[in-house]
Structure formats: structure tokens, C-alpha cells
Amino acid sequence: MKMNKYKIIAICGKSASGKDTLLHMIMNNTALHEIVSCTTRPPREGEVDGVNYFFMTLEDFAHKDCMGEMLEVSHFRDWYYGTAIDGLDVDKINVGVFNPEGIVSLMRDDRVELYVVLVQASDKCRLIRSLKREVNPDVDEIVRRYLTDKEDFELFSQIYEPDYTLDTEGVGFSYLEEAARDIVLDAIRHWAEETN
């Protein structure tokens, strides 16, 4: 008997590259299922439990992981992030944002049909976005993210070539809307070719 696999469009990119904007553009297609990740980190200002993340205690997260209820888990600083299996829909295309470690875990999971989208923009563009998106930006945190991204994505590029690469620098919403449609259609074609 053939097992149904989770079809996942995994969006990946450095900080302030436009991952969340692309996710929202893709999610305008109601036939898709948005993945809401779990995390042990505390919510940031304005984040809502169950919308931005499922905020969990370390104990609850570890229990879910030990019970085999997490599809992928990654560790960053003192926090854990992951995708709960019960947060996926086997009958729909699932779409979410993942870090390189999460992508590698998904690549190794035979329950998943993966389509990876790499979102990129120049360091200058990302820095300007980082400074503009917060009222009082934490410059130390921005620098830390940039250094971490540099290391993570250098390693990632050596082991995986994305299915789709999108440069978001200097583009408008209409371009992103068109790219979002193209990504979904290309992912569907990709999976159809794999089954033939």
C-alpha cells in the first residue's frame, strides 16, 4: 500500500530576505495549508500563539519530540524550533518557512515530498529592511543574525540546490504575487514529474 506523503513547499532565506512576505503571498491561494512551527522561545512583541508560532515550554516540546510527533527539529541558541506532524495536512500542499537545519531534516524524511524555495537579497537590502521593520532595532541582534546566516547558508549551499530561487531586492508586490503563483505551479509540476 502506497503511503501518502506530506507535500511541503519549504521557504528558506537569510534574515530580512523576504521569506514571510513570500509566504503570505503564496498563502493567498486557499487550497494550501500554512505550517505554523512550534518553538520554545518566548513570543516577540505582537506575535500571537497559534498564528506566528505555537509557543511551548521546553518540557512540552521535548515530550512531543520524544513521542515522534515532530517532523523536524532545529536548535538555535537556547531555543528549539520544529514542525509538529499534527500541524500538517496530507491532503493539501503545506507551506512554511524553515532554516537550513530544518530543510536538511526534511530532505532526509521519507514521509515528505519537498520543494525548496530560496529567497535572497543583497546584504545591504536586508540590512535596510532589518532597520526599518522595527521601531527600536536591536543592532547587536541584527549583526548576530547576519553572522549566523553567513555560516548557515554557506554550509547549506554546499549540500543542497534549491528547486526555485527568488531574488526579492527592489521588486514590487505584483512581481511577488506572480512569483508566488509560479512557485506553486512549479512545485505541482515537480511532484507530478517525480511520480511519473
Residue map of PLM features:
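P-loop (Walker A) phosphate-binding loop of NTP-binding proteins
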Residues: 14
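ATP-dependent small-molecule kinase phosphotransfer cores
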Residues: 39-94, 98
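Walker A/P-loop
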Residues: 20
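ATP-binding Walker
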Residues: 17
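Hydrophobic anchor at the beta1->P-loop junction of P-loop NTPases
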Residues: 11
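Conserved phosphate-donor/acceptor-positioning beta-strand/loop module used by diverse small-molecule
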Residues: 95-99, 109-132
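Post-Walker A helix-loop "phosphate-sensing" segment adjacent to the P-loop in P-loop NTPases
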Residues: 28-36
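Small-molecule kinase domains that catalyze NTP-dependent phosphoryl transfer to phosphate-bearing small molecules
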Residues: 136-195
